A protein has these predicted regions:
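Alpha-helical segment proximal to the catalytic Tyr-Lys
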Residues: 133, 178-182, 252
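Residue(s) in the substrate-gating loop at a strand-loop-helix junction
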Residues: 149
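Canonical Rossmann dinucleotide-binding motif of NAD(H)/NADP(H)-dependent dehydrogenases/reductases
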Residues: 7-40
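Active-site loop immediately N-terminal to the catalytic Tyr-X3-Lys motif
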Residues: 106, 154-160, 182, 231, ...
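C-terminal substrate-recognition "lid" of short-chain dehydrogenase/reductases
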Residues: 125, 230-261, 266
Length: 295
């Protein structure tokens, strides 16, 4: 019987990780390197490139690390040119870059909206356009994984353009899965919910951050965990494990779909496990209401 590593068939492949030096992207890079994948990564945070590159090299992998802003077309093109020059194959692409700052749509400037679209959808199109010829050149097929969000699948007040851009990425991914199926190039999205990270904290409105500053870290964590059925937020490694699956031959017949790595929040659809015995309901009941308002 073959081992799971043999069935995954990742050893010796090459991956490009867009936004691969910090946060979730770093976890993805290290997970792939740990599975025997040579990695090419770019990141706007140039100071994070060296430690991530060094850590991956210590695992015995070949590493290309490039400082680049993926939302700048010329920098993304230069990165892929470097990938093609360094490696004779490309098997896996992971588009991690994304992000937003919470704001009501009517308060956002056209420039802010355009930035949200480019950061969460526009560069993904360009990345796929650059990656496909390199994958085709190898003739082995490949896997492209685009990070999205639960907000691509529900209304998200305060994140209108972000949610719309991620939804566009989702349907673009589905469509390209159909177009590229004949090349055995699989495309899927990975949709997390809230993940503890510097980027997610920066996305919060300043006034909300100010209010939260007076609340204990334990209380903040409890409030974040309350609406997740598994009662915990994911680690970046949890998301990286989802990437490993989609990148590997274990998912050889999986394409055009979304893997929700969210602890069950998509399934819960707004039902929250309220405290004080109210259990799973979309609104608080007597146990919580009495403690909030009967004073």
């Amino acid at each position: 019987m073959s081992t799971i590593e043999q069935r995954a068939n990742l050893n010796g492949k090459v991956a490009a990780i867009i936004g691969g030096a910090s946060g979730i992207g770093e976890a993805v890079t290290m997970a792939l390197a740990g599975a025997g994948v040579d990695v090419a990564l770019c990141d706007i945070k140039s100071e994070a490139l060296t430690p991530t590159r060094t850590a991956a090299e210590k695992l015995g992998r070949q590493v290309l690390a490039v400082a680049a802003d993926a939302t700048r077309s010329e920098q993304l093109a230069a990165f892929y040119a470097a990938v093609g020059a360094r490696f004779d194959r490309l098997d896996i692409v992971v588009n991690v870059v994304g992000g937003v700052r919470r704001r009501d749509f009517m308060e956002a400037t056209p420039e802010q909206c355009a930035g949200d679209i480019q950061r969460n959808y526009g560069y993904v199109i360009e990345s796929v356009r650059h990656a496909v010829p390199l994958i085709r050149k190898g003739g082995r097929g490949g896997s492209i994984i685009n990070f999205t969000t639960i907000e691509a699948h529900r209304g998200a007040a305060g994140f209108a353009v972000y949610a719309g851009a991620k939804a566009a990425t989702t349907n673009f991914t589905r469509t390209m899965a159909v177009e590229l199926g004949k090349d055995r190039i699989r495309l899927n999205t990975l949709a997390p919910d809230t993940t503890p990270s510097e980027g997610n904290m920066k996305a919060l409105a300043p006034e909300l951050l100010e209010r939260m500053a007076g609340i204990s870290p334990a209380a903040v964590k409890a409030s974040m965990d309350m609406y997740i059925p598994m009662k915990a937020q994911p680690n970046p490694e949890d998301l990286a494990n989802g990437v490993l699956f989609l990148a590997s031959d274990l998912a050889a017949f999986v394409t055009g779909t979304t893997l929700h790595v969210d602890g069950g929040t998509m399934a819960a659809a707004g039902f929250i496990d309220w405290p004080y015995g109210d259990s799973y309901l979309p609104v608080p009941m007597d146990g919580t209401l009495k403690r909030l308002f009967d004073r």
